[in-house]
């Protein structure tokens, strides 16, 4: 039996074993159409807090990940609940590192309530390799039938 485990261990590439398993908490949000129609029925989400953490120079596999955490609250009075919505991100100013901005519309699976936290990650590199990052992002709510709400702006910035 030990021989079987040893053989299986040897067949797994070392690179796959060393890959960082941490990922964002976001998942794709299904919409019935790829077209978006701006709607005044959807308010902008309220940005409560933005946390921005650069990658580290440690020896652990995930140390070079950067983290951007955006905590939002859905305004009262909307005819939509937060769990009925997805969110789309776009860069208004600056250049986002590859992998930071989610492709398409995203949601946090299983979420309930008026508050939500989006965890975005990217390969930030070691501190000596990092570029300064100053971004202005927009985040908008999107319904399953393609209605898109007003944007909220998120400022992200910091020297490496």
Where in the sequence are the language-model features?
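Extracellular fibronectin type III
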Residues: 147-158
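N-terminal signal peptide c-region/cleavage motif recognized by signal peptidases
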Residues: 11-15
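Extracellular Ig-like/FN3 beta-sandwich strand-entry sites
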Residues: 130-134
């Amino acid at each position: 039996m030990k021989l079987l485990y040893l053989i299986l261990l040897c067949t797994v590439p070392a690179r796959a074993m060393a890959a960082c398993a941490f990922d964002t908490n976001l998942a794709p949000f299904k919409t019935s159409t790829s077209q978006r129609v701006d709607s005044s029925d959807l308010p902008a989400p309220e940005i409560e807090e933005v946390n921005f953490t650069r990658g580290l120079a440690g020896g652990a596999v995930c140390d070079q990940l950067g983290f951007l955490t955006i905590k939002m609250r859905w305004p009262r009075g909307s005819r939509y609940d937060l769990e009925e919505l997805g969110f789309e991100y776009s860069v208004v100013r600056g250049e986002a590192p590859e992998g930071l901005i989610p492709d398409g519309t995203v949601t946090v699976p299983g979420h309930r309530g008026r508050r939500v936290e989006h965890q975005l990650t990217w390969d930030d590199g070691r501190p000596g390799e990092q570029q300064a990052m100053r971004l202005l992002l927009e985040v908008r709510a999107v319904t399953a039938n393609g209605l898109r709400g007003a944007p909220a702006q998120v400022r992200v910035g910091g020297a490496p």
